[in-house]
Amino acid sequence: GKTIQVIPHITDEIKRNVKLLGNKYKFDFVITEIGGTVGDIESLPYLESIRQLKWELGKDALCVHLTYVPYLAAAGELKTKPTQHSVKELQSAGIQPDVLVLRTEHELSTTLRKKVALFCNVDENAVVQSIDAPTIYEVPILMQSQGLDVTILKKMGLPVGDTPGLGPWRAFLERRHKAEETAPLHIALVGKYDLQDAYKSIREALSQAGTYNDRKVSVDFVNSEKLTDENVAEALKGMAGVLIGPGFGERGVAGKFVAIKYARTHDIPTFGICLGMQCIAIEFARNVLGYADANSREMDEKTPHNVIDIMEEQKSITNMGGTMRLGAYECVLQKGSKAYEAYGTEHIQERHRHRYEFNNSFKDAYEAAGMKCVGINPESDLVEICLLYTSPSPRDYAAS
């Protein structure tokens, strides 16, 4: 019966979520990132929650503040005022950062570090440089070279011990550097979202896959909204593979169909994720099975050939918030399939975020035409992975 207030109700819930992992599992550290900019109104409840947590946990909590040190090319000088101002704002919220990590394009001098330490009220060895790196994978090595790990351990009163060699990580970086020297393998990422962070995990996954196969991978974005029968050949020219990206809604889907058809008829390996897999299934139904009006219920509720349909348990849901099929679900792979070869095991788990699934009513027709359903959820019998066999090796690889 109480009135919900930002303090204490919202802040208490934020604190509960921050402490959740630490209370539930045996972790040495739990890292929580508060994004945004200090001073923004949206971040105020989170900053207050952090202030309270710091007070409650004492030395068991440590605040690391990331700031940007701009470089004025005209003056040839790094400016620390933005960092000083940011820390002042943080202090006004009741938080004294323990460590400052300064993003910079140029090396920070000892004099500049002392200046920042003095005016931001932190130890000099707690001012850590984070210089621009070629890839994000270089950052842990750079942070270790700056002594960030030792600084954190000392400030939390924990034994320092021997410095880890990070052998596997360094080996990965060395392999990555060698892979970057090879001729690039071009992969077309077909999607509709202009903000490339929407596909960040896909880009990184392809990049890592390239490293482990000793080959540089160049991911070339292709805007599906601008893709037509007239320009698709030029857009996909020289591509070693095509990835049809995930998404929601009908916008940009027509262009995905164009890309899928071109890739299928020109023997270009194609991989569809989520909506991308559904688009591959729809294009196959239209142009191979002969269902010209095949579609997803998401795009056309009245289509008689709803090869992609809303999940049965989703049909009665009216509140769309947080009710999708979310998180990791089990998938059993068909032995001998390309998917089984890729994973090296029969039982896998992959994350999901959708309401629509392959309609099993059409399963026999697909398999008779060469598209095999090789990954099935054992509980719901939902199709998770399809493979199109049209040549000695499977070509279209569509994963839900």
Q: Positions of the model-derived regions?
A:
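Conserved N-terminal/central alpha/beta ligand/cofactor-binding core
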Residues: 1, 320-324, 346-349
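Flexible phosphate-sensing "switch/lid" loops adjacent to ATP/NTP-binding sites
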Residues: 1-215, 225-241, 248-249, 256, ...
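General small-molecule cofactor/ligand-binding pocket signal
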Residues: 128, 218-222, 374
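Cysteine-nucleophile active-site neighborhood
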Residues: 235-330, 336-338, 400
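Catalytic beta-strand/loop cores that center a nucleophilic Ser/Cys/Thr
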Residues: 335-388
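Conserved small/polar residues in nucleotide/adenosyl-binding loops
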Residues: 389-394
